[in-house]
Amino acid sequence: MTLGRRLACLFLACVLPALLLGGTALASEIVGGRRARPHAWPFMVSLQLRGGHFCGATLIAPNFVMSAAHCVANVNVRAVRVVLGAHNLSRREPTRQVFAVQRIFENGYDPVNLLNDIVILQLNGSATINANVQVAQLPAQGRRLGNGVQCLAMGWGLLGRNRGIASVLQELNVTVVTSLCRRSNVCTLVRGRQAGVCFGDSGSPLVCNGLIHGIASFVRGGCASGLYPDAFAPVAQFVNWIDSIIQRSEDNPCPHPRDPDPASRTH
């Protein structure tokens, strides 16, 4: 393991020890961001246990969502509720659609080195696609992001070390960086100030040029350190696998939308 830092657990019960350790921690909430416009990101998903949000996810087909593998590594998935169409988690919203998890698919997740931190959850039904619930668009297989690409991170969770959990979905402009980053991750940094992803909301998407390029995985040096980049699982490395999982579903003949013209995009 080349990260050179201790791992700390994700869930909110483990936030305080992880903050004190100041080491590598599973991500991610948004620190230093802003409130998203209601339902601006209709593919955004809240994973919940007993009515409480614990991770983010992305709707990639009407009956499949994508998240971080560590989110469900030690969780009774039968108790997980997948909430679509949410914006303010503290309110009852008529836009929501709620499902249970029927099946999970992993791809060689390595919890020690935090590699292949991706999971696909098959829902026990199919979402109704509308203005508030939509399927995300994924990049072409193998497409890499170059240094300096502007992206958007998002999620629900803690707003900082001494602040509470966000009820309203947060978003944050971030920049892709290749230094201090493994090739097995996509990494981002907010230049010039302390902002980024942190505890309480792993699995949330990283949106670059309208495509989901990352799944929030872990941070180093504490939340929003301004020194170490935040690490995301690289979605483009798994697109063929994702397609193969979705296409196996007999009741979902249409997988996620593809990047319509990969050659026209510069990353």
UniProtKB/Swiss-Prot annotation:
Please report a single Pfam family linked to this protein: Trypsin
Q: Domain Peptidase S1: where? A: 30-247
Lineage of source species: Eukaryota, Metazoa, Chordata, Craniata, Vertebrata
The Swiss-Prot or TrEMBL record describes its family as follows: Belongs to the peptidase S1 family. Elastase subfamily.
Q: What is the effect of changing residue 262 to L?
A: Found in patients with severe congenital or cyclic neutropenia
Listed Gene3D superfamilies:
Trypsin-like serine proteases
Could you list this entry's UniProt keywords, alphabetically sorted: Cytoplasmic vesicle, Disease variant, Disulfide bond, Glycoprotein, Hydrolase, Protease, Serine protease, Signal, Zymogen
EC main group? hydrolase
Q: Where in the cell is it found?
A: Cytoplasmic vesicle, Phagosome
Look up the EC number in the record and give it. 3.4.21.37
Q: How does it assemble?
A: Interacts with NOTCH2NL. Interacts with agaphelin, an antihemostatic protein from Anopheles gambiae.
Name the UniProt record assigns to this protein? Neutrophil elastase
Species: Homo sapiens
Task performed by this protein: Serine protease that modifies the functions of natural killer cells, monocytes and granulocytes. Inhibits C5a-dependent neutrophil enzyme release and chemotaxis. Promotes cleavage of GSDMB, thereby inhibiting pyroptosis. Promotes blood coagulation. Through the activation of the platelet fibrinogen receptor integrin alpha-IIb/beta-3, potentiates platelet aggregation induced by a threshold concentration of cathepsin G (CTSG). Cleaves and thus inactivates tissue factor pathway inhibitor (TFPI).
**Which PROSITE patterns does the UniProt entry name for this protein?**
TRYPSIN_DOM (PS50240), TRYPSIN_HIS (PS00134), TRYPSIN_SER (PS00135)
| Superkingdom in the source lineage | Eukaryota
Recorded GO molecular functions are: cytokine binding; endopeptidase activity; heparin binding; peptidase activity; protease binding; serine-type endopeptidase activity; transcription corepressor activity
UniProt lists the gene as ELANE
Record-linked CDD domains: Tryp_SPc
Implicated disorder: Cyclic haematopoiesis: Autosomal dominant disease in which blood-cell production from the bone marrow oscillates with 21-day periodicity. Circulating neutrophils vary between almost normal numbers and zero. During intervals of neutropenia, affected individuals are at risk for opportunistic infection. Monocytes, platelets, lymphocytes and reticulocytes also cycle with the same frequency. Neutropenia, severe congenital 1, autosomal dominant: A disorder of hematopoiesis characterized by maturation arrest of granulopoiesis at the level of promyelocytes with peripheral blood absolute neutrophil counts below 0.5 x 10(9)/l and early onset of severe bacterial infections.
Q: Which residues form the propeptide?
A: 28-29
Which coarse location class describes where this protein primarily resides?
cytoplasm
- Which effect does the record note for changing residue 81 to P? In SCN1 and CH
GO CC terms of this entry: azurophil granule lumen; cell surface; collagen-containing extracellular matrix; cytoplasm; cytosol; extracellular exosome; extracellular region; extracellular space
List glycan-bearing residues: 88, 124, 173
